[in-house]
Amino acid sequence: MGSKTEMMERDAMATVAPYAPVTYHRRARVDLDDRLPKPYMPRALQAPDREHPYGTPGHKNYGLSVLQQHVSFFDIDDNGIIYPWETYSGLRMLGFNIIGSLIIAAVINLTLSYATLPGWLPSPFFPIYIHNIHKSKHGSDSKTYDNEGRFMPVNLELIFSKYAKTLPDKLSLGELWEMTEGNRDAWDIFGWIAGKIEWGLLYLLARDEEGFLSKEAIRRCFDGSLFEYCAKIYAGISEDKTAYY
């Protein structure tokens, strides 16, 4: 009876299934609770991980959800609405060139605007309403935001336990590609493309000198503090280029 109970307890906590090799190759972390309280609990205001259990030091949330914080950098006039020209300006502040910024801004506002509008009629100006940004969340993503725009710490940690094969806290370009492939939902073509574009842009923005994207850069991208930091670097206000490596 004892051995049967032990077997049931072991199976109940297993993260690898013998006949599902993918569960072996994409490991789940089981050691989060010691440094990150309740890693499974969605965080509305902060983006914590094991190394930063209280989120980004000094980053103000202003009562916004983590997903709202992620996009608020591009709200240049701080009125809760992001127009294409503001997206363009934000991209330029991050160091993207004119042509790239024009294309990226057009794609972002064209694809995200309608879902965030307060009514049914489309707008010719393609605004993105920050208070409705959770409605623009697409499939085939990392699930690090939940459907209400809260941050899921456990899913950030799973990105690295599953896909960081070279270094435990960094992803290579190939590992990023493998992650976006692993995130794909069936027949979700828009989500497949959107995921690769988003992660590709983040890689261009925040990769280190060795071509890796660090966990800290990714975490700070989720709460938007990375954009503020990179804008200061590009403007020459800050010289510390290693804060998120």
Swiss-Prot record:
Residues 62-97 form the EF-hand domain. The proline-knot motif (118-127) may be involved in targeting to lipid bodies. Transmembrane regions are predicted by sequence analysis tools, but these regions probably constitute hydrophobic domains associated to phospholipids. Binds 1 heme b (iron(II)-protoporphyrin IX) group. It comes from Arabidopsis thaliana. GO terms for biological process: defense response; embryo development ending in seed dormancy; lipid droplet organization; negative regulation of lipid storage; oxylipin biosynthetic process; seed maturation. Ca(2+) binds at residues 75, 77, 79, 86. GO terms for cellular component: endoplasmic reticulum; membrane; monolayer-surrounded lipid storage body. This is Peroxygenase 1. Homodimer.
